Swiss-Prot record:
Protein name: Sperm-associated antigen 8
Predominant localisation class: cytoplasm
Mn 2: annotated segments: 384-398
Tissue and organ distribution: Expressed in trachea multiciliated cells.
Residue ranges with Low complexity bias: 20-32, 125-160
Keyword annotations: Cell cycle, Cell projection, Cilium, Cytoplasm, Cytoplasmic vesicle, Cytoskeleton, Differentiation, Fertilization, Flagellum, Nucleus, Spermatogenesis
GO biological process per UniProt: cell differentiation; flagellated sperm motility; positive regulation of transcription by RNA polymerase II; single fertilization; spermatogenesis
InterPro entries for the chain: Sperm-assoc_Ag8
Molecular-function GO terms, alphabetical: microtubule binding
Lineage: Eukaryota, Metazoa, Chordata, Craniata, Vertebrata
Region (Disordered) location: 1-32, 123-221, 324-348, 455-484
Length: 484
Protein backbone atom coordinates (compact mmCIF):
# COMPACT_ATOMS: atom_id res chain seq x y z
CA UNK A 1 0.00 0.00 0.00
CA UNK A 2 2.82 2.40 0.84
CA UNK A 3 4.52 1.69 -2.47
CA UNK A 4 1.40 2.41 -4.50
CA UNK A 5 0.57 5.58 -2.56
CA UNK A 6 4.10 6.92 -2.83
CA UNK A 7 4.10 6.15 -6.56
CA UNK A 8 0.88 8.13 -7.03
CA UNK A 9 2.30 11.04 -5.06
CA UNK A 10 5.52 11.08 -7.06
CA UNK A 11 3.57 10.95 -10.33
CA UNK A 12 1.31 13.82 -9.23
CA UNK A 13 4.31 15.93 -8.28
CA UNK A 14 6.16 15.13 -11.46
CA UNK A 15 3.16 16.01 -13.60
CA UNK A 16 3.15 19.48 -12.07
CA UNK A 17 6.73 19.96 -13.19
CA UNK A 18 6.07 19.25 -16.86
CA UNK A 19 6.34 22.36 -19.01
CA UNK A 20 3.47 23.62 -21.11
CA UNK A 21 3.22 23.25 -24.85
CA UNK A 22 3.94 26.94 -25.45
CA UNK A 23 7.31 26.90 -23.77
CA UNK A 24 9.26 25.69 -20.81
CA UNK A 25 7.40 27.94 -18.37
CA UNK A 26 5.15 26.34 -15.81
CA UNK A 27 1.44 27.10 -15.74
CA UNK A 28 1.59 27.70 -11.99
CA UNK A 29 3.99 30.64 -12.18
CA UNK A 30 2.16 33.72 -10.84
CA UNK A 31 5.31 35.88 -10.67
CA UNK A 32 6.57 35.89 -14.25
CA UNK A 33 8.38 39.24 -14.31
CA UNK A 34 11.23 40.36 -12.12
CA UNK A 35 13.48 43.33 -12.13
CA UNK A 36 16.90 42.59 -13.61
CA UNK A 37 18.66 44.73 -11.09
CA UNK A 38 17.44 42.75 -8.10
CA UNK A 39 18.25 39.51 -9.86
CA UNK A 40 21.83 40.44 -10.73
CA UNK A 41 22.47 41.62 -7.17
CA UNK A 42 21.24 38.43 -5.59
CA UNK A 43 23.13 36.21 -8.04
CA UNK A 44 26.47 37.36 -6.73
CA UNK A 45 25.40 36.89 -3.10
CA UNK A 46 24.04 33.41 -3.65
CA UNK A 47 27.15 32.36 -5.59
CA UNK A 48 29.39 33.15 -2.62
CA UNK A 49 27.01 31.43 -0.18
CA UNK A 50 26.79 28.34 -2.36
CA UNK A 51 30.57 28.02 -2.61
CA UNK A 52 30.94 28.07 1.19
CA UNK A 53 28.05 25.64 1.68
CA UNK A 54 29.50 23.32 -0.96
CA UNK A 55 32.85 23.08 0.79
CA UNK A 56 31.22 22.41 4.18
CA UNK A 57 28.80 19.81 2.83
CA UNK A 58 31.56 18.06 0.86
CA UNK A 59 33.74 17.67 3.95
CA UNK A 60 30.81 16.51 6.08
CA UNK A 61 29.61 14.00 3.48
CA UNK A 62 33.10 12.57 3.05
CA UNK A 63 33.36 11.99 6.80
CA UNK A 64 29.97 10.30 7.00
CA UNK A 65 30.32 8.11 3.91
CA UNK A 66 33.54 6.55 5.14
CA UNK A 67 31.69 5.30 8.26
CA UNK A 68 28.29 4.23 7.01
CA UNK A 69 27.65 1.67 4.23
CA UNK A 70 25.41 2.28 1.28
CA UNK A 71 21.79 1.47 2.18
CA UNK A 72 20.60 1.26 -1.40
CA UNK A 73 20.52 -1.91 -3.42
CA UNK A 74 21.17 -0.08 -6.72
CA UNK A 75 23.48 2.89 -6.60
CA UNK A 76 22.68 4.16 -10.11
CA UNK A 77 18.91 3.90 -10.02
CA UNK A 78 18.34 7.64 -9.72
CA UNK A 79 21.43 8.68 -11.69
CA UNK A 80 21.00 6.70 -14.90
CA UNK A 81 22.21 8.55 -17.96
CA UNK A 82 19.24 7.23 -19.92
CA UNK A 83 16.78 9.23 -17.79
CA UNK A 84 16.22 12.72 -19.10
CA UNK A 85 14.27 14.44 -16.36
CA UNK A 86 12.69 13.96 -12.99
CA UNK A 87 9.24 13.63 -14.54
CA UNK A 88 10.44 10.96 -16.96
CA UNK A 89 12.37 9.06 -14.31
CA UNK A 90 9.67 8.72 -11.67
CA UNK A 91 6.57 8.49 -13.84
CA UNK A 92 5.56 6.01 -16.45
CA UNK A 93 5.62 2.23 -16.67
CA UNK A 94 9.38 1.82 -16.17
CA UNK A 95 9.36 3.36 -12.70
CA UNK A 96 6.32 1.29 -11.72
CA UNK A 97 8.00 -1.84 -13.07
CA UNK A 98 11.08 -1.23 -10.95
CA UNK A 99 9.01 -0.69 -7.83
CA UNK A 100 6.92 -3.82 -8.38
CA UNK A 101 9.99 -5.99 -8.90
CA UNK A 102 11.78 -4.70 -5.81
CA UNK A 103 14.48 -2.74 -7.64
CA UNK A 104 14.48 -0.04 -4.99
CA UNK A 105 16.59 -0.67 -1.92
CA UNK A 106 14.47 1.76 0.13
CA UNK A 107 10.78 2.49 0.39
CA UNK A 108 9.46 4.92 -2.25
CA UNK A 109 7.75 6.82 0.58
CA UNK A 110 11.08 8.60 1.09
CA UNK A 111 10.40 10.74 -1.99
CA UNK A 112 7.88 12.69 0.03
CA UNK A 113 10.81 14.58 1.50
CA UNK A 114 11.25 16.47 -1.79
CA UNK A 115 8.91 19.32 -0.95
CA UNK A 116 7.97 21.54 -3.88
CA UNK A 117 5.34 24.25 -3.77
CA UNK A 118 4.09 25.26 -7.24
CA UNK A 119 3.02 28.64 -5.88
CA UNK A 120 6.48 29.49 -4.51
CA UNK A 121 7.98 31.15 -7.59
CA UNK A 122 11.17 32.69 -6.29
CA UNK A 123 13.85 32.90 -8.90
CA UNK A 124 17.06 30.94 -8.62
CA UNK A 125 19.09 34.07 -8.22
CA UNK A 126 16.58 35.71 -5.85
CA UNK A 127 16.04 32.70 -3.55
CA UNK A 128 17.12 33.35 0.01
CA UNK A 129 17.37 29.61 0.78
CA UNK A 130 20.01 27.24 -0.48
CA UNK A 131 20.20 26.89 -4.25
CA UNK A 132 20.13 23.48 -5.96
CA UNK A 133 23.18 21.50 -5.04
CA UNK A 134 24.10 23.58 -2.01
CA UNK A 135 22.25 21.67 0.69
CA UNK A 136 23.58 21.86 4.22
CA UNK A 137 23.60 18.10 4.71
CA UNK A 138 25.54 15.34 2.99
CA UNK A 139 23.26 14.64 0.04
CA UNK A 140 24.00 12.18 -2.74
CA UNK A 141 25.08 14.92 -5.12
CA UNK A 142 27.89 16.48 -3.09
CA UNK A 143 30.27 13.61 -2.61
CA UNK A 144 33.95 14.34 -2.57
CA UNK A 145 34.93 10.74 -3.19
CA UNK A 146 35.13 9.36 -6.73
CA UNK A 147 31.88 7.56 -7.60
CA UNK A 148 30.47 5.67 -10.53
CA UNK A 149 29.13 8.84 -12.17
CA UNK A 150 32.28 10.93 -11.88
CA UNK A 151 33.25 10.25 -15.47
CA UNK A 152 32.76 12.63 -18.34
CA UNK A 153 29.52 10.99 -19.44
CA UNK A 154 26.45 13.17 -19.79
CA UNK A 155 24.68 12.95 -16.41
CA UNK A 156 21.06 13.78 -15.85
CA UNK A 157 21.79 16.14 -13.00
CA UNK A 158 24.58 18.34 -14.39
CA UNK A 159 24.44 20.50 -17.45
CA UNK A 160 26.15 23.54 -18.83
CA UNK A 161 25.40 25.22 -22.06
CA UNK A 162 23.88 28.22 -23.67
CA UNK A 163 20.45 29.10 -22.49
CA UNK A 164 19.85 32.54 -23.93
CA UNK A 165 16.39 31.72 -25.13
CA UNK A 166 13.56 32.11 -22.63
CA UNK A 167 13.25 28.91 -20.63
CA UNK A 168 15.89 27.16 -22.71
CA UNK A 169 17.74 24.13 -21.43
CA UNK A 170 20.89 22.37 -22.41
CA UNK A 171 22.86 19.21 -21.62
CA UNK A 172 26.56 18.89 -21.33
CA UNK A 173 29.17 16.48 -19.99
CA UNK A 174 28.89 16.20 -16.22
CA UNK A 175 32.08 16.34 -14.23
CA UNK A 176 32.47 16.30 -10.48
CA UNK A 177 33.85 14.33 -7.58
CA UNK A 178 30.52 12.71 -6.53
CA UNK A 179 27.77 10.80 -8.26
CA UNK A 180 25.74 13.12 -10.35
CA UNK A 181 27.85 16.11 -9.31
CA UNK A 182 28.60 18.83 -11.77
CA UNK A 183 29.28 22.49 -12.07
CA UNK A 184 28.45 25.03 -14.71
CA UNK A 185 26.19 27.81 -15.67
CA UNK A 186 22.48 27.04 -15.64
CA UNK A 187 20.36 27.52 -18.74
CA UNK A 188 18.81 30.88 -19.31
CA UNK A 189 21.90 32.87 -18.38
CA UNK A 190 21.98 31.81 -14.73
CA UNK A 191 25.44 32.20 -13.24
CA UNK A 192 24.83 30.17 -10.07
CA UNK A 193 27.53 27.58 -9.50
CA UNK A 194 27.27 24.68 -7.05
CA UNK A 195 26.98 20.98 -6.70
CA UNK A 196 23.76 19.40 -7.83
CA UNK A 197 21.30 17.41 -5.72
CA UNK A 198 21.99 14.33 -7.78
CA UNK A 199 19.01 12.06 -8.25
CA UNK A 200 16.60 14.38 -6.43
CA UNK A 201 16.55 17.34 -8.92
CA UNK A 202 17.16 17.45 -12.64
CA UNK A 203 18.99 20.55 -13.78
CA UNK A 204 17.62 20.37 -17.28
CA UNK A 205 14.72 22.55 -16.17
CA UNK A 206 16.82 24.87 -14.05
CA UNK A 207 15.43 28.38 -13.60
CA UNK A 208 16.67 31.31 -15.67
CA UNK A 209 15.54 34.41 -17.49
CA UNK A 210 12.33 34.34 -19.41
CA UNK A 211 9.20 32.35 -18.81
CA UNK A 212 10.92 29.12 -17.71
CA UNK A 213 9.76 27.07 -14.70
CA UNK A 214 10.77 28.80 -11.51
CA UNK A 215 10.15 27.08 -8.21
CA UNK A 216 11.76 26.71 -4.82
CA UNK A 217 14.39 23.95 -4.64
CA UNK A 218 14.99 24.17 -0.91
CA UNK A 219 14.67 20.63 0.54
CA UNK A 220 13.26 20.10 4.04
CA UNK A 221 15.45 19.30 7.02
CA UNK A 222 14.58 15.60 6.91
CA UNK A 223 16.04 15.33 3.40
CA UNK A 224 18.95 17.75 3.80
CA UNK A 225 20.14 15.99 6.94
CA UNK A 226 19.41 12.31 6.37
CA UNK A 227 20.41 9.63 8.81
CA UNK A 228 23.78 8.00 8.57
CA UNK A 229 22.33 4.62 7.55
CA UNK A 230 20.58 6.20 4.47
CA UNK A 231 23.70 7.75 2.89
CA UNK A 232 25.17 5.61 0.08
CA UNK A 233 28.83 4.69 -0.11
CA UNK A 234 30.18 4.22 -3.61
CA UNK A 235 33.83 3.76 -2.72
CA UNK A 236 34.09 -0.01 -3.01
CA UNK A 237 31.02 -0.69 -5.14
CA UNK A 238 30.60 -1.31 -8.83
CA UNK A 239 27.89 -0.04 -11.14
CA UNK A 240 25.32 -2.69 -10.15
CA UNK A 241 26.48 -3.84 -6.72
CA UNK A 242 23.85 -5.20 -4.33
CA UNK A 243 23.72 -3.69 -0.90
CA UNK A 244 23.88 -5.95 2.13
CA UNK A 245 22.92 -4.65 5.58
CA UNK A 246 25.69 -4.25 8.07
CA UNK A 247 25.78 -7.07 10.58
CA UNK A 248 26.30 -6.47 14.26
CA UNK A 249 29.69 -7.61 15.47
CA UNK A 250 28.93 -10.33 17.99
CA UNK A 251 31.34 -11.43 20.66
CA UNK A 252 31.24 -14.75 22.45
CA UNK A 253 31.06 -14.57 26.21
CA UNK A 254 32.64 -17.34 28.27
CA UNK A 255 30.29 -18.60 30.95
CA UNK A 256 31.41 -20.80 33.84
CA UNK A 257 28.02 -22.43 34.32
CA UNK A 258 26.96 -25.31 32.04
CA UNK A 259 24.67 -24.64 29.12
CA UNK A 260 24.83 -22.53 25.97
CA UNK A 261 24.61 -18.86 26.90
CA UNK A 262 24.29 -17.63 23.33
CA UNK A 263 25.88 -14.66 21.61
CA UNK A 264 27.08 -11.58 23.46
CA UNK A 265 25.05 -8.44 22.96
CA UNK A 266 25.83 -4.80 23.80
CA UNK A 267 24.66 -3.54 27.22
CA UNK A 268 22.40 -0.92 25.66
CA UNK A 269 20.55 -3.66 23.79
CA UNK A 270 20.32 -5.85 26.88
CA UNK A 271 18.88 -3.00 28.95
CA UNK A 272 15.92 -2.60 26.59
CA UNK A 273 14.90 -6.29 26.54
CA UNK A 274 12.76 -6.45 29.62
CA UNK A 275 9.56 -7.74 28.02
CA UNK A 276 9.00 -11.48 27.99
CA UNK A 277 8.52 -13.00 24.57
CA UNK A 278 5.59 -15.29 24.11
CA UNK A 279 6.82 -18.60 22.76
CA UNK A 280 4.75 -20.60 20.37
CA UNK A 281 3.20 -23.88 21.52
CA UNK A 282 5.58 -26.80 21.45
CA UNK A 283 3.43 -29.02 19.24
CA UNK A 284 1.47 -28.46 16.07
CA UNK A 285 -0.98 -31.39 16.15
CA UNK A 286 -1.87 -33.21 19.35
CA UNK A 287 0.52 -31.48 21.71
CA UNK A 288 -1.20 -28.16 21.06
CA UNK A 289 -4.48 -29.58 22.33
CA UNK A 290 -3.11 -31.06 25.54
CA UNK A 291 -4.30 -29.42 28.70
CA UNK A 292 -0.88 -29.63 30.34
CA UNK A 293 0.70 -27.84 27.40
CA UNK A 294 -1.71 -24.94 27.64
CA UNK A 295 -1.49 -24.80 31.44
CA UNK A 296 2.33 -24.52 31.44
CA UNK A 297 2.71 -22.33 28.37
CA UNK A 298 3.36 -19.21 30.45
CA UNK A 299 6.32 -20.95 32.06
CA UNK A 300 8.03 -21.27 28.67
CA UNK A 301 8.39 -17.50 28.26
CA UNK A 302 12.04 -16.47 28.06
CA UNK A 303 13.48 -12.92 28.06
CA UNK A 304 14.28 -11.94 24.50
CA UNK A 305 17.98 -11.09 24.69
CA UNK A 306 18.83 -10.95 28.36
CA UNK A 307 19.50 -14.57 29.33
CA UNK A 308 20.60 -16.01 26.02
CA UNK A 309 19.13 -19.19 24.60
CA UNK A 310 16.13 -21.09 25.89
CA UNK A 311 18.19 -24.15 26.83
CA UNK A 312 20.40 -22.05 29.07
CA UNK A 313 17.41 -20.36 30.69
CA UNK A 314 15.77 -23.71 31.52
CA UNK A 315 18.98 -25.56 32.41
CA UNK A 316 17.65 -26.16 35.96
CA UNK A 317 14.09 -26.95 34.83
CA UNK A 318 10.96 -24.86 34.57
CA UNK A 319 10.55 -22.43 37.39
CA UNK A 320 7.51 -23.15 39.54
CA UNK A 321 6.40 -26.18 37.57
CA UNK A 322 6.91 -28.84 40.25
CA UNK A 323 6.39 -26.79 43.39
CA UNK A 324 3.59 -24.81 44.99
CA UNK A 325 6.01 -22.10 46.14
CA UNK A 326 7.78 -20.65 43.09
CA UNK A 327 9.97 -18.32 45.15
CA UNK A 328 11.15 -21.00 47.59
CA UNK A 329 14.82 -22.00 47.33
CA UNK A 330 15.82 -25.36 45.96
CA UNK A 331 16.25 -28.11 48.55
CA UNK A 332 19.84 -29.12 49.24
CA UNK A 333 18.90 -32.68 50.26
CA UNK A 334 19.74 -35.46 47.85
CA UNK A 335 19.27 -39.20 47.86
CA UNK A 336 22.97 -39.81 48.33
CA UNK A 337 23.19 -37.50 51.32
CA UNK A 338 20.13 -39.00 53.00
CA UNK A 339 21.26 -42.61 52.50
CA UNK A 340 24.85 -42.04 53.57
CA UNK A 341 25.88 -43.79 56.79
CA UNK A 342 29.13 -42.68 58.40
CA UNK A 343 31.50 -45.43 59.61
CA UNK A 344 31.01 -46.48 63.24
CA UNK A 345 34.63 -47.19 64.26
CA UNK A 346 37.26 -44.71 63.26
CA UNK A 347 40.13 -46.36 65.23
CA UNK A 348 43.00 -48.07 63.50
CA UNK A 349 43.15 -51.91 63.69
CA UNK A 350 45.69 -53.45 66.07
CA UNK A 351 47.07 -55.93 63.58
CA UNK A 352 47.32 -55.84 59.88
CA UNK A 353 45.48 -57.76 57.23
CA UNK A 354 48.45 -60.00 56.40
CA UNK A 355 48.71 -61.25 59.98
CA UNK A 356 45.00 -62.08 60.10
CA UNK A 357 45.21 -64.11 56.88
CA UNK A 358 48.21 -66.11 58.13
CA UNK A 359 46.42 -66.91 61.37
CA UNK A 360 43.37 -68.20 59.53
CA UNK A 361 45.47 -70.46 57.30
CA UNK A 362 47.35 -71.94 60.27
CA UNK A 363 44.10 -72.63 62.11
CA UNK A 364 42.68 -74.56 59.17
CA UNK A 365 45.84 -76.61 58.79
CA UNK A 366 45.97 -77.62 62.48
CA UNK A 367 42.30 -78.62 62.48
CA UNK A 368 42.85 -80.96 59.57
CA UNK A 369 45.81 -82.69 61.28
CA UNK A 370 43.93 -83.26 64.56
CA UNK A 371 40.89 -84.63 62.78
CA UNK A 372 43.03 -87.08 60.81
CA UNK A 373 44.58 -88.47 64.00
CA UNK A 374 41.28 -88.99 65.80
CA UNK A 375 39.34 -90.73 63.04
CA UNK A 376 40.41 -94.22 61.83
CA UNK A 377 41.31 -94.90 58.30
CA UNK A 378 38.28 -95.74 56.27
CA UNK A 379 38.33 -98.17 53.41
CA UNK A 380 36.78 -97.23 50.28
CA UNK A 381 33.55 -99.20 49.93
CA UNK A 382 32.37 -100.26 46.56
CA UNK A 383 29.19 -98.67 45.55
CA UNK A 384 26.57 -101.45 45.03
CA UNK A 385 22.90 -101.12 44.41
CA UNK A 386 20.14 -103.36 45.82
CA UNK A 387 19.47 -104.92 42.46
CA UNK A 388 23.13 -105.60 41.97
CA UNK A 389 23.34 -107.20 45.43
CA UNK A 390 20.30 -109.45 44.95
CA UNK A 391 21.36 -110.52 41.52
CA UNK A 392 24.45 -112.25 42.87
CA UNK A 393 22.54 -114.22 45.57
CA UNK A 394 22.04 -118.03 45.00
CA UNK A 395 18.38 -119.04 44.69
CA UNK A 396 16.86 -122.10 46.54
CA UNK A 397 15.53 -124.81 44.29
CA UNK A 398 11.74 -124.88 44.38
CA UNK A 399 9.92 -128.24 44.71
CA UNK A 400 7.11 -130.09 46.47
CA UNK A 401 7.16 -130.09 50.23
CA UNK A 402 8.57 -133.06 52.05
CA UNK A 403 5.94 -135.70 52.93
CA UNK A 404 4.88 -135.97 56.51
CA UNK A 405 4.00 -139.73 56.35
CA UNK A 406 4.19 -142.62 54.00
CA UNK A 407 1.28 -142.84 51.60
CA UNK A 408 -0.12 -145.93 50.03
CA UNK A 409 -1.75 -145.37 46.78
CA UNK A 410 -3.55 -148.65 47.08
CA UNK A 411 -5.61 -147.61 50.06
CA UNK A 412 -5.67 -143.82 49.78
CA UNK A 413 -8.07 -142.01 47.60
CA UNK A 414 -6.33 -140.14 44.86
CA UNK A 415 -6.53 -136.35 44.62
CA UNK A 416 -8.61 -135.46 41.69
CA UNK A 417 -10.19 -132.33 40.40
CA UNK A 418 -13.58 -133.33 41.72
CA UNK A 419 -12.31 -133.99 45.18
CA UNK A 420 -10.69 -130.55 45.31
CA UNK A 421 -13.90 -128.88 44.13
CA UNK A 422 -16.28 -131.06 46.22
CA UNK A 423 -16.47 -128.70 49.28
CA UNK A 424 -17.64 -125.94 47.02
CA UNK A 425 -20.69 -127.91 45.91
CA UNK A 426 -23.92 -127.52 47.92
CA UNK A 427 -25.43 -130.59 49.61
CA UNK A 428 -22.26 -132.61 49.64
CA UNK A 429 -21.09 -134.77 52.52
CA UNK A 430 -18.57 -133.34 54.93
CA UNK A 431 -15.16 -134.45 53.78
CA UNK A 432 -12.95 -134.66 56.73
CA UNK A 433 -10.09 -136.82 55.48
CA UNK A 434 -8.59 -137.74 52.23
CA UNK A 435 -10.15 -141.16 52.25
CA UNK A 436 -13.65 -139.98 53.10
CA UNK A 437 -16.03 -141.41 50.57
CA UNK A 438 -17.87 -139.15 48.32
CA UNK A 439 -21.47 -138.98 49.40
CA UNK A 440 -24.07 -136.61 50.60
CA UNK A 441 -23.61 -134.79 53.87
CA UNK A 442 -25.71 -136.45 56.55
CA UNK A 443 -24.14 -134.97 59.65
CA UNK A 444 -27.35 -133.44 60.84
CA UNK A 445 -29.13 -136.83 60.70
CA UNK A 446 -26.39 -139.08 62.11
CA UNK A 447 -27.36 -140.68 65.39
CA UNK A 448 -25.37 -139.77 68.49
CA UNK A 449 -23.97 -143.21 69.17
CA UNK A 450 -22.61 -143.31 65.64
CA UNK A 451 -20.97 -139.91 65.86
CA UNK A 452 -19.09 -140.54 69.15
CA UNK A 453 -16.35 -142.64 67.67
CA UNK A 454 -15.42 -140.52 64.70
CA UNK A 455 -11.99 -140.98 63.19
CA UNK A 456 -9.38 -138.33 63.75
CA UNK A 457 -8.06 -136.26 60.90
CA UNK A 458 -5.68 -138.04 58.63
CA UNK A 459 -6.81 -141.42 59.78
CA UNK A 460 -8.50 -143.92 57.56
CA UNK A 461 -12.00 -144.80 58.34
CA UNK A 462 -13.18 -148.34 59.01
CA UNK A 463 -15.57 -148.88 56.27
CA UNK A 464 -16.70 -152.20 57.51
CA UNK A 465 -17.47 -150.97 61.00
CA UNK A 466 -18.98 -147.85 59.73
CA UNK A 467 -21.05 -149.83 57.41
CA UNK A 468 -22.29 -152.08 60.11
CA UNK A 469 -23.12 -149.24 62.47
CA UNK A 470 -24.80 -147.45 59.76
CA UNK A 471 -26.91 -150.36 58.85
CA UNK A 472 -27.84 -151.04 62.46
CA UNK A 473 -28.65 -147.41 62.98
CA UNK A 474 -30.79 -147.47 59.96
CA UNK A 475 -32.52 -150.54 61.09
CA UNK A 476 -33.06 -149.24 64.58
CA UNK A 477 -34.26 -146.03 63.21
CA UNK A 478 -36.55 -147.88 60.94
CA UNK A 479 -37.89 -149.98 63.77
CA UNK A 480 -38.21 -147.10 66.07
CA UNK A 481 -39.82 -145.17 63.39
CA UNK A 482 -42.11 -148.01 62.55
CA UNK A 483 -42.96 -148.71 66.18
CA UNK A 484 -43.70 -145.11 66.87
Amino acid sequence: METSESTDRSQSRCLDLQPSSDGLGSSSDPFSSWDGRHRSALVAATAAASAAATAASTARAAALWTKSPAPYSHGNLLTEPSSDSLTERYTGPRFTHKISHGRLGFQPAYFSHIAWNPYTTNDLSSSRGPIPGSSSGPVPGSSSSPGPDSSSDPGPSSSSGPGGSPGGSGRGPGHGPGPGGGSGQGPGGGSGQGTDLGPAIDSRHSPGHGHGPRFNFSAPVGFRNPRGDLIPNYTGCKHHCHWEPQKQSWKFLKVSEPGARGLWKPPEVEGKSTVLSETLPRGQCLLYNWEEERATNYLDQVPVMQDGSESFFFRHGHRGLLTLQPQSPTSSCTTQKDSYQPPKSHCQPIRGKREAILEMLLRQQICKEVQAEQEPTRKDSEVESVTHHDYKKELVQAGPPAPTKIHDYHTEQPETFWLERAPQLPGVSNIRTLDTPFRKNCSFSTPVPLSLEQPLPFEPESYSQHGEISSLACQGGGQGGGGG
